[in-house]
């Protein structure tokens, strides 16, 4: 399952371990029980999230492949209860891939046409110059780990993210929210879409009882 985000990014589900029933089994082991029936299992998930008993959801794990601008990745990796492995700019020559924001769509009502054109041109030109400098430094045999210092935060990076459902729900509360940067929001909404497809009962109860953001309430991600 791959969801395209922004102009060049994506959220791709590589693997997952468990689903709604994994949390039910983990919760019922406390009393030496297993799955009972669908309706009671669903109500148990609702009870767990309503009462804040979230440890059973740590047994559901997702592994994603993420491609996003570096400035988004740096916000993402502040969520430390997870595992990350990122594309290395020390060993890999970074592609000429930069996030180009759609200023007209985002700020067309607040900025005049002339300023929007100037801003878009300035961003594109700065990207081009920085990558030209990067390539020149590499051609001069400057190590890639040092040559990359001229590249902007808008450069695309890639990483693998493994996270349990409990931590993922915390991520969504903070990032699928209007207080988060818009670009970060778009990736969080894509993650929410994957989460909902794998764990629909958990997702529904999470939104109802534990979600602290404002972008997912009353909408389908």
Curated annotation (Swiss-Prot):
GO terms for molecular function: flavin adenine dinucleotide binding; NADPH binding; thymidylate synthase (FAD) activity; thymidylate synthase activity. Pathway: Pyrimidine metabolism; dTTP biosynthesis. GO terms for biological process: dTMP biosynthetic process; dTTP biosynthetic process; methylation. Binds 4 FAD per tetramer. Each FAD binding site is formed by three monomers. Its cofactor is FAD. InterPro entries: Thymidylate_synthase_ThyX, Thymidylate_synthase_ThyX_sf. A motif (ThyX motif) lies at residues 78-88. FAD binds at residues 55, 78-80, 86, 164-166, 170. It is an enzyme of class 2 (transferase). It catalyses: dUMP + (6R)-5,10-methylene-5,6,7,8-tetrahydrofolate + NADPH + H(+) = dTMP + (6S)-5,6,7,8-tetrahydrofolate + NADP(+). The active site is at residue 175. DUMP binds at residues 75-78, 86-90, 148, 175. CDD domains: ThyX (cd20175). PROSITE patterns: THYX. Residues 9-209 form the ThyX domain. Keywords: FAD, Flavoprotein, Methyltransferase, NADP, Nucleotide biosynthesis, Transferase. Disulfide bonds: none annotated. Belongs to the thymidylate synthase ThyX family. This is Flavin-dependent thymidylate synthase. It comes from Pseudothermotoga lettingae (strain ATCC BAA-301 / DSM 14385 / NBRC 107922 / TMO) (Thermotoga lettingae).
């Amino acid at each position: 399952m791959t969801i395209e985000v922004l102009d060049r990014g994506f959220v791709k589900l590589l693997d997952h371990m468990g689903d709604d029933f994994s949390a039910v089994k983990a919760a019922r082991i406390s009393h030496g029980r297993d799955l009972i029936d669908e309706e009671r299992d669903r109500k148990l998930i609702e009870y767990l999230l309503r009462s804040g008993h979230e440890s059973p959801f740590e047994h559901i794990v997702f592994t994603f492949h993420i491609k996003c601008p570096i400035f988004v990745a740096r916000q993402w990796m502040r969520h430390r209860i997870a595992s990350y492995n990122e594309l290395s700019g020390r060993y890999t020559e970074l592609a000429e891939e930069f996030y180009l924001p759609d200023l007209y769509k985002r700020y067309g009502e607040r900025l005049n046409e002339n300023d929007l054109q100037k801003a878009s041109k300035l961003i594109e030109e700065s990207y081009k110059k920085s990558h030209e400098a990067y390539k020149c430094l590499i051609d001069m045999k400057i190590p890639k780990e040092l040559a990359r210092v001229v590249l902007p935060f808008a450069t695309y990076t890639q990483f693998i993210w493994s996270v349990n459902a409990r931590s993922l729900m915390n991520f969504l509360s903070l990032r699928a929210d209007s207080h988060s940067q818009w670009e970060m929001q778009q990736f969080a909404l894509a993650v929410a879409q994957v989460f909902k497809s794998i764990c629909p009962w958990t997702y529904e109860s999470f939104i109802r009882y534990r979600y602290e953001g404002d972008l997912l309430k009353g909408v389908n991600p």
